[in-house]
Amino acid sequence: MWWKFRDPWDDSFAKGVTAALEAHGREAHDPWCIGFFVDNEINWGGPSDLAKWILQSPADQPAKAAFADWLAKAYGSFPALGEKWGRPYADRADFMGSVALPGEGAKDDLYKFSCIVIDEYFRRTREAVKAFDPQLLYLGCRLAGHARDEVAAACARHCDVVSYNIYRETIDDWRWPGGIDAPVMIGEFHFGATDRGPFGTGVRQADNQVDRAEKMKGYVRSALANPQIVGVHWHQFSDQATSGRFDGEYLQVGWTDICDTPYPEAVSALRQLAGEIYSTR
């Protein structure tokens, strides 16, 4: 599932982040809590899509006003902008009221402002997290798979630790795009089997519970072998209900079943891994 992108210039954006953090105030002050993920697997669209979506928004969209400010500074007037874009604008109000996409002449501007939007999202989210508790780490937004270079670079600039959800057999050969150097936490990974529990195996399938435990160990060991990875975060602690969660997902991916009974193979694998971590790295 890809979650919709929110307008970082809207007053409700920072308030929403703060409200979400405050709702987890008890966890935030737990000594075992190192930080927070904010958001999950956002839909960033293509290289210029964020700017295009902003142009197609109504006149009262705060991001559209920010785009207008940026363009006015770059071109001096909206008629001059219209000449470049191949879309006549009489003035700022005309620009704000239009939802039509411009011509090929807008290509560079759309890409540049999309990058600005991405940076603003991470900057404002970091501000909200640090205002809530400066000691907590901002763990990013759990990027899905391999994010575009622009997203990865902005994330690395503003996050204490960058989170990626990477569903693979192993990640020892995974590297940052564009040669970026920043600490990475795996936000999600799992393996599922259908010999016990619900009927869904999740993203990565195992033959049975023994095979699942071996695959889990292989993934964690590959993370230990990758110097850019500082942690892995299993998805999820318990199996999902056979009747499905809010979107119908029902996976056998937990360390415990739906009756909170541990899978002994998983527990044994975790215990073995815990004994290896500090001698390995």
Predicted regions and their residues:
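Aromatic-lined substrate-binding rim segments of carbohydrate-active enzymes
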Residues: 1-29, 122-132, 156-157, 177-179, ...
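Polysaccharide-binding and catalytic clefts of secreted carbohydrate-active enzymes
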Residues: 30-152
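Glycoside hydrolase catalytic-domain groove-lining segments
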Residues: 112, 116-202, 217-224
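The substrate-binding groove and active-site-proximal loops of carbohydrate-active enzymes
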Residues: 1-18, 71, 104-119, 159-168, ...
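Active-site clefts of carbohydrate-active enzymes
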Residues: 1-6, 96-111, 144, 180-219, ...
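Aromatic-rich peripheral "rim/lid" segments of glycoside hydrolase catalytic domains that contact
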Residues: 53-66, 235-281
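Substrate-binding cleft of secreted/luminal carbohydrate-active enzymes
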Residues: 31-35, 39-41, 137, 196, ...
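Short, solvent-exposed loop/turn and secondary-structure capping segments
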Residues: 46-52, 174-176, 196-197, 244-245
